[in-house]
Amino acid sequence: MASSIVTSSLKPLAMADSSSSTIFSHPSISSTISSSRIRSSSVSLLTGRINLPLSFSRVSLSLKTKTHLKKSPFVSFVAQTSDWAEEGGEGSVAVEETENSLESQDVSEGDESEGDASEGDVSEGDESEGDVSEGAVSERAEFPEPSEEAKLFVGNLAYDVNSQALAMLFEQAGTVEIAEVIYNRETDQSRGFGFVTMSSVDEAETAVEKFNRYDLNGRLLTVNKAAPRGSRPERAPRVYEPAFRVYVGNLPWDVDNGRLEQLFSEHGKVVEARVVYDRETGRSRGFGFVTMSDVDELNEAISALDGQNLEGRAIRVNVAEERPPRRGY
């Protein structure tokens, strides 16, 4: 009796179409189906599948078979979402391209602005440099450098003559542009020569005529044209005139430069008096040299002092021989 009731109640289910709504005649089945629909509403929306209780396994089989034969809405849903993803991807690419284009516009505008600024800076800098160079040229035109031909060599300077004293001396011949005494770097002492640059060649020639063989502090100056720049400078010649220089021999050991100068100053003006000393012991070698101012005084000193007794020794006085120049190897 029970099996006939179940069979008769399941016939409408087997004949029903899954696409149309199904009317169940048995109240327990309909209530069970409705409760299962409420519990699995999210699943039925995706798959369209109706889950029945396990007690009715045959009905569940028939329903599963029919739902698989139908076209699953889940596939279409996935396809639609794939299309949306592609559309979204295209849209994102378009957005990125738009952003890139905007950024490129910003960069190009920035480059143009920077380029304009740099061009402005360069042009302003060039103009300012141009002004400075023009000013420098104008200053050079107002203050030209003195001519090399107006530069003079001054030799045989006394060691106490400085650059200021040299300039004051040569101002008697004209305008002095530069006056310089050369000093030893190690000892900071004068080397006995210097250079003077006059304002013109004519004034330089006047200075040569006026101060060559000029007596400055007891020494005769040597003044001539200086060697041009770039050429090898000639060594300053020593001014020891044989006619004015005498040799003094057999001197007592305690006679120094001052005593020798005092002895010869009684017969004229003494330019230089020097006793020769031994470099190792520092003792006098018993001879020296005296330079007189002219030939008359020289001859008078020789006549008066040669053979004279000086502190118990007869000194010898005669004209000094000029030493040959040393050759460098």
From Swiss-Prot:
Residues where Phosphoserine is found: 123, 128
Subcellular location as annotated: Plastid, Chloroplast
SUPFAM superfamilies: RNA-binding domain, RBD
Sequence repeats: 108-112, 113-117, 118-122, 123-127, 128-132, 133-137
Keyword Oxidoreductase attributed: no
Listed GO MF terms: mRNA binding; poly(U) RNA binding; RNA binding
Amino acid composition bias (Acidic residues), ranges on this chain: 96-132
Gene3D superfamilies found in the cross-reference section: 3.30.70.330
Disruption phenotype: No visible phenotype under normal growth conditions, but mutant plants exhibit multiple specific editing defects in chloroplast transcripts. Mutant plants have increased sensitivity to cold stress.
Organelle targeting sequence: 1-77
UniProt-annotated stretches for the region Disordered: 87-145
Cellular component GO terms, alphabetical: chloroplast; chloroplast envelope; chloroplast stroma; chloroplast thylakoid membrane; cytosol; ribonucleoprotein complex; thylakoid
Keyword Repeat set for record: yes
GO aspect biological process, one term: response to cold
Keywords: Chloroplast, mRNA processing, Phosphoprotein, Plastid, Repeat, Ribonucleoprotein, RNA-binding, Transit peptide
Entries under Pfam families matching the protein: RRM_1 (PF00076)
Region ranges (6 X 5 AA approximate tandem repeats of S-E-G-D-X): 108-137
RRM domain segment(s): 152-228, 244-322
Physiological role: Required for specific RNA editing events in chloroplasts and stabilizes specific chloroplast mRNAs. Associates with the 3'-terminus ndhF mRNAs and protects them against 3'-exonucleolytic degradation. Required for normal chloroplast development under cold stress conditions by stabilizing transcripts of numerous mRNAs under these conditions. May modulate telomere replication through RNA binding domains.
Name used for this protein in its record: 31 kDa ribonucleoprotein, chloroplastic
Species: Arabidopsis thaliana (Mouse-ear cress)
Gene: CP31A
